[in-house]
Amino acid sequence: MPNLHDIERRIKSVTSTKQITRTMEMVAAAKIRRASERVESALPWAVAISDMLISTAKYAHLDNEPLLQVHDEVKRVLIVAVTSDRGLAGGFNTNVLRYVEKLSKEKQREGAEVEVAACGKKAIGYFTYRGIEPVFSFAGYSADPEFAQAAELSGYVMQAYAEGKLDEVFIVYNHAKNAAEQTLVEQQVLPVKEESYADLLGLKAKEEDIFKSFRE
């Protein structure tokens, strides 16, 4: 049976752990708040730009645009996995990585060669442990992403697709509805599909012809 000294030491240990946990919660709450503010400030721009592109694309002559062409045969597929850099996030990263593995196996069964791009330390560690070498790896940017990394990856993707080296490109990530709820998203990036972006951003096809007044 523990003596009084052991009990006191145990109480101090539990109290110390509680204080550390509370501090971690406060730090996490502050980070979530800042991230939410950045997302909320950027979303109107994303919606407006996507809405404009969707509305105008059907009036442009894009029949020969390489990024809109559906390839006759799907031989090579790229899947971009987006995770966090740190753990202690429940199923946040696990759900993404398991889905990427599931999607990869589906495409392989269909006869396609699959390569992956890993965004986040958790994705990099997951693929490295399984002997999979990502074509691109980015770490340390989940809290404060930069345009340079996105431009590098998108440049590779667009060039490879236009040259016929890639036939389909998907991105898998978690869409955070709030701090407690995330929705797993699989989005086809290439070939470009209007519905993919419209559904994602909550855009609806407009009944009216926004260019009608200009043509009359």
Predicted regions located by residue number:
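C-terminal beta-strand-loop-alpha-helix "lid" module of Rossmann-like NAD(P)-dependent dehydrogenases
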Residues: M1-E216
